[in-house]
Design a protein with these regions (language model features):
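An acidic site on a long C-lobe helix of protein kinase domains
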Residues: 4-8, 70, 74-77, 148-152
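Generic anion/oxyanion-binding catalytic loop in active/binding sites
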Residues: 16, 67-70, 142
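Short, glycine-rich, amphipathic interfacial segments at transmembrane boundaries or analogous
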Residues: 38-69, 120-138
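A hydrophobic, helix-centered structural microdomain
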Residues: 1-62, 155-198
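Cytosol-/stroma-facing membrane-proximal "stalk/adaptor" domains immediately downstream
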Residues: 122-182
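Intrinsically disordered, low-complexity boundary segments flanking structured domains
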Residues: 26-30, 42-46, 78, 106-113, ...
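A short, structured surface patch at a secondary-structure boundary
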Residues: 57-122, 156-159
Length: 198
C-alpha cells in the first residue's frame, strides 16, 4: 500500500471526487471571480522529499466587514483536488505547510516529508482538536512510518465529518498563519530569524 496502492487510489479517486464536487466548485469560482481580483491564489508548500510544490486555493474576499463564507469554510480548498490529480498531494497525509514553516521544522520531524501532504489530515485520528504543532509533526512522522489503507479511510471520513461541521480551520492551513508565526509569538525565534526563513 505504501509504495504503490496509495498513489493509485489517489489517481483513481481524485478525479472522481473532483467530478462530484465540480458543480459546487464552478459556483464558488463564479462567486469568487465576482468579488476578488483572481479566482485562485497560489501557495508554495513543502511536498514529498522536501521539494517545493505550488498549489492553488480559492482567493480570499470579504463581504462587508466579514470574511466570505467560501473563504472561511472548506469550500476554499476545493481546488486542492487538482493537486491530488497531478500527483503533488494525496487525499490523506500530513497537513500542508508553507516553505517558511518547513524551513523552521526540527530535523527530528523530517520523516513527515517522506510522504505527500494531504487534503485530509492524517493527524485527525490522533487528536480531537488541532494539537500543538510539534505534537502534530510527531503524529505525521508516525503516520509516514505506519500508514495503511485502514488508517487513511478512517482519517478521510473523520476529516470529512469535521469539515462538514465547519471545523476546516483545525487542520487545513494552506495560506493561513502557521508554525513560523507561532514560534515568533512564543519567543522561540526572533523577527530576524523569521525574515531569514522567508
Amino acid at each position: 500500500y505504501r509504495f504503490f496502492a496509495k498513489a493509485f487510489l489517489d489517481f483513481l479517486f481524485g478525479p472522481i471526487f473532483f467530478v462530484i464536487i465540480s458543480p459546487a466548485t464552478a459556483v464558488c469560482a463564479v462567486i469568487v471571480k465576482k468579488h476578488a481580483k483572481k479566482v485562485c491564489e497560489k501557495h508554495w508548500i513543502v511536498g514529498k522529499g522536501g521539494k517545493p510544490v505550488c498549489v492553488r486555493v480559492f482567493s480570499d474576499f470579504s463581504r462587508g466587514d466579514k470574511k466570505s463564507y467560501i473563504s472561511g469554510s472548506a469550500l476554499k480548498y476545493f481546488p486542492l483536488l487538482l493537486s491530488v490529480i497531478s500527483g503533488k498531494m494525496s487525499l490523506v497525509g500530513p497537513s500542508p505547510i508553507s516553505l517558511r514553516d518547513g524551513a523552521l521544522i526540527d530535523d527530528e520531524y523530517e520523516a513527515r516529508f517522506d510522504v505527500r501532504p494531504g487534503i485530509f489530515s492524517s493527524a485527525a485520528l490522533a487528536f480531537a482538536r488541532r494539537p500543538e504543532y510539534e505534537e502534530m509533526f510527531a503524529a505525521d512522522c508516525d503516520y509516514a512510518k505506519k500508514r495503511s489503507l485502514l488508517s487513511d479511510v478512517r482519517a478521510f471520513f473523520t476529516s470529512m465529518l469535521r469539515a462538514m461541521r465547519g471545523e476546516k480551520g483545525e487542520f487545513l492551513c494552506v495560506g493561513g498563519e502557521g508554525y513560523a508565526e507561532e514560534l515568533l509569538a512564543r519567543g522561540v525565534i526572533t523577527a530576524e530569524q523569521l525574515e531569514e526563513a522567508q
